Amino acid sequence: VDTENLPKTWSEFREVCKQVTEAGKGKYYGMIEGGKQVNRLEIAIRALSCLAGSKSNDIGVISMVDGKNVLNSDAMIQAFDFYSGLVQDGSFHPDTVNLAAPEARALFAQNQAAFLIQGSWCISTWEKENPDLEFGVMEMPVPDDGAKGGLPYIGAQPWMGISKTSDNPELAAKYLQGLYSEEYQSGVVEDGGFVSAIKGVNEKYMKDGVMKDYYTLALEQGKLCPDPIVGNADASAVYANITEISPNLGQIVQGTLTGKTDYKDTLNTLAENTQKEWENGIKKAQEAGAEVSAEDFEFKNWNPLEDYTAEDYQNK
């Protein structure tokens, strides 16, 4: 792999993976992934489809375009075609579908693959456990005709709290204050494994060169997506009434990794059943008193090449 001229498009990436695999002769491959974890596979395929313009949003979030979900959109199928092409080329490590993410990370560190999709926590792990490993980070490759969106993420929702029945709420509060203090967060960032949510900490304390590259690329290619719950808090009542359809998106990717090529039909079935489940969830939420409709899950002013801002919610 020419590290000074990394593949930028799907075709270029596929060709490089093929070259690596052929040169490896069974010892190493172009790509490896933690294919046993279907949630990770869903994150990856959603990201790739968003680069193709699907507006599929972050994992666990339903977004609609023209009143329909995008699980079988042209962009989603393009993303599956890309993954399937890598599989048909033999470029995926043969153990991929049976590996958890830490196992894939370890095999990558043993030079059994040239590329994998994982998070920033790999950086400090490799530097500590595999000090001789030469590695770097790169942007996700985009469709040959250019990116039509960015890598999707949504703003963090509150996920830590103190129970009202806690015997020591003051102590719990002090713990949370300490956890998110600059003193503690600076150490986490300096260690090179994580990005802080506290304003200014990353810029001030991030020292690791690879981590800085990761942070820069994430800011450039990642795009904040609209969150229906931010637009209307009552949208949460819909999620509470939804039962996940099986096989889900990640499971369909998993099947593709084993060589299955009938994903178009499976995606059509997933999209159809998801639409029914979603419309039923909206109906149940409305019957329970929630002021919510299908329009709360569609954002016609969403440009997936840009961050979706508070002002965009107001002008939806």
Task: Identify the residue ranges that each predicted region occupies.
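Alpha-to-beta junction loops
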Residues: 26-28, 110-119, 131-133
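Extracytoplasmic/periplasmic substrate-recognition and gating elements
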Residues: 89-91, 128-200, 230-235, 251
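A local structural motif
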Residues: 1-5, 84-98, 112, 129-135
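Extracytoplasmic/periplasmic solute-binding protein
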Residues: 11-68, 84, 113
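Long, aromatic- and glycine/proline-rich binding clefts that accommodate carbohydrate-like moieties
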Residues: 131, 138, 190-257, 290-316
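Short helix-initiation/N-cap motifs at beta->coil->alpha
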Residues: 8-14, 95-109
